[in-house]
């Protein structure tokens, strides 16, 4: 089974993740040691602060610095973690934020969001007006969703993919938080997983297999295989 990391901040010097190529390679090599050979590079794209054109240029500079040094045996896909705001929908082309050549787009919202009808309208616009498939990042950070899985169900009915972070399943993570997440996984609410790695101290990438082992122990190895299969579909569509 190939392992896929669907969310990371490894591109150098573009956001609050790796500040240099050297630090980027440290994270990539730690993932590789665990057998993670397919990695999505998804720097923050704050749509209320920077245009899509300027973001793409800034990201390209980081890509040009890192790509020649990607470790042997690793594949990477470039995308973005897009903070969704009304400024996205001003007529600009933001397809550059999708995973590679795919129409999947990693999306983030304010953690205090109640996922009201106004927020849901953003998902409608992305899916119907832009023909994109939103991937909602780190579902565990939205209390409104964790406390009311029916809203997650509404999102999934719209075709939204739900992502969770590996560090939410480690020994250091809250027992009750893990309990809620495992219930969501068993209920079919969570589709893919990512490290969200910024460094070895901020969302440590070395927790990847620990998380998969925990999920496997609680939900079965077939669940992990399904999550990786979902990730593989997105990753391959981006190549």
Enumerate the predicted regions with their spans.
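Non-catalytic positions within long, well-ordered alpha-helices that form the structural scaffold/packing
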Residues: 29-32, 127-128, 185-186
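Active-site environment of divalent metal-dependent phosphoester hydrolases
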Residues: 46-49, 83-85, 140-145, 169-172, ...
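Short acidic/histidine-rich active-site segments
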Residues: 189-205
């Amino acid at each position: 089974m190939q392992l896929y990391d669907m969310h990371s901040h490894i591109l150098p010097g573009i956001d609050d993740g790796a500040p240099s190529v050297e630090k980027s390679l440290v994270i990539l090599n730690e993932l590789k040691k665990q057998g993670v050979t397919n990695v999505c590079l998804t720097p923050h794209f704050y749509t209320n602060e920077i245009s899509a054109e300027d973001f793409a240029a800034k990201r390209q500079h980081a890509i040009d610095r890192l790509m020649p040094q990607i470790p042997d045996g690793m594949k990477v896909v470039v995308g973005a973690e897009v903070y969704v705001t009304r400024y996205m929908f001003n007529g600009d082309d933001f397809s550059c934020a999708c995973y590679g050549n795919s129409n999947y787009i990693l999306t983030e919202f304010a953690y205090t969001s109640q996922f009201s009808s106004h927020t849901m309208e953003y998902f409608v616009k992305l899916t119907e007006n832009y023909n994109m498939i939103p991937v909602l990042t780190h579902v565990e950070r939205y209390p409104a969703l964790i406390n009311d899985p029916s809203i997650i169900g509404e999102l999934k009915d719209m075709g939204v993919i739900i992502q969770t972070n590996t560090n939410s399943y480690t020994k250091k993570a809250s027992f009750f938080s893990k309990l809620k997440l495992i219930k969501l996984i068993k209920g079919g609410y969570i589709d893919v997983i990512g490290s969200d790695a910024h460094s070895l101290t901020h969302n440590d990438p070395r927790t990847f297999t620990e998380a998969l082992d925990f999920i496997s122990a609680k939900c079965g190895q077939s669940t992990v295989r399904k999550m990786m299969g979902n990730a593989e579909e997105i990753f391959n569509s981006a190549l």
